[in-house]
């Protein structure tokens, strides 16, 4: 498992309520002027990441553009035997 530093415009979606991640993305896009936001999740939290983007798009930012979706697997152990699915969704204002 490789640990890489996260960019400041990255949101890691976990078990908190979805609205928390929506508000974090809104803050990055509106107040901090980030050109794009990367929403990442692994395993069971992938559905929360998708819900976050859908809430942003349908309720808050009508011209939200989904620039890129990357689906991949990450190794959980050094041998690479255990893997977990992951998703990265890059969004920006249109």
Curated annotation (Swiss-Prot):
It is found in: Cytoplasm; Chromosome. GO terms for molecular function: double-stranded DNA binding; RNA binding. It comes from Aeropyrum pernix (strain ATCC 700893 / DSM 11879 / JCM 9820 / NBRC 100138 / K1). The lineage of its organism: Archaea, Thermoproteota, Thermoprotei, Desulfurococcales, Desulfurococcaceae. One of its GO terms (cellular component) is chromosome. GO terms for biological process: chromosome condensation. This is DNA/RNA-binding protein Alba 1. NCBIfam families: PRK04015.1 (NF003088). Binds double-stranded DNA tightly but without sequence specificity. Involved in DNA compaction. Belongs to the histone-like Alba family. Keywords: Chromosome, Cytoplasm, DNA condensation, DNA-binding.
């Amino acid at each position: 498992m490789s640990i890489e530093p996260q960019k400041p415009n990255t949101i890691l979606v976990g078990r908190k309520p979805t609205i928390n991640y929506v508000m974090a993305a809104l803050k990055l896009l509106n107040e901090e002027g980030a050109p794009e936001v990367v929403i990442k999740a692994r395993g069971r939290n992938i559905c929360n990441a998708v819900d976050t983007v859908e809430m942003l798009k349908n309720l808050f930012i009508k011209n939200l553009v989904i620039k890129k979706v990357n689906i991949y697997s990450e190794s959980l152990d050094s041998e690479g035997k255990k893997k977990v699915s992951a998703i990265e969704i890059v969004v920006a204002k249109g």
